[in-house]
Amino acid sequence: MTVIYPSPIFGPVHSRRLGVSLGINLLPEDGKVCTFDCIYCECGFNSDHRPKKPLPTREEVRAALEARLQDMQKNGPVPDVLTFAGKGEPTAHPHFPEIIEDTLALRDKYFPKAKVSVLSNSTFIHRPAVFEALNKVDNNILKLDTADEAYIRELDRPAGHYSVREIIGGMKAFKGNCIIQTMFLKGGFGDKDMDNTSDKYVLPWLEAVKEISPRQVMIYTIDRETPDHDLQKATHEELDRIAALVREVGMAVSVSY
């Protein structure tokens, strides 16, 4: 069963990585809009969830967010974070930069201690307006599942033009103002072995992470049902080993098992 995210506001939910998180979904609630089609995505495969409804407008997002924040200010709970996530890639919304401006202003008005986080697959960070918007949020969380482009094409299945070297270059441009998020898993997809926990994938990934020099690395594994049922969680030991390698090069790392 795939996860359903209402639009434009959902939750709050308890996030393994972020705490009490109020979700902001800039995609239609009846489908999925993403430049990736990850085989582990809790929202299912893109082809199974084509939306019929339009994207929420900037005005709809702002009004819904303010109403929810007013309710939370009165009735609780206090959010730790306002998180752009949901059913697809938030930076694909044509008014993403303006929505970030609105969100930061509303955060400052109602819950100034809350963080604003964006979970992004990094495919639009080459756009100047998107880059500038991501540079303003508290937690600019960018996906990099490996540094191996052939593997990314099997795991994340990006649409259109995709170059992992260009993505890494775009991440470097944040000059440390980013968090790298990486999914580690095992199992197969069709006849392909999708295990990325071995040194074959981990060591080149670690070199890329060193090159990007983020302020933090988040490593995690499958938590919910995936559209491909042959995938498996990475073990605690495997994640701990990878985390130790990250710490050895002097970077902060968090692990979600």
State what each model feature region is:
Residues 2-17, 63, 70, 186-257:
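Auxiliary Fe-S-binding modules of radical SAM enzymes
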Residues 17-63:
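Canonical Radical SAM [4Fe-4S] cluster-binding loop centered on the CxxxCxxC motif
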Residues 21-23, 81, 141, 179:
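Short hydrophobic-acidic sequence motifs that mark active-site Asp/Glu residues
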Residues 24, 63-71, 99-106, 206:
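Short, well-ordered amphipathic alpha-helices
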Residues 31, 89-90:
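Short strand->helix junction
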Residues 45-81, 95-98:
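Conserved alpha-helical substructure of the radical SAM core
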Residues 83-89, 121:
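Glycine-rich beta-strand-to-loop/alpha-helix junction loops that act as flexible
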Residues 92-232:
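Conserved AdoMet/S-adenosylmethionine-binding subsite of the radical SAM
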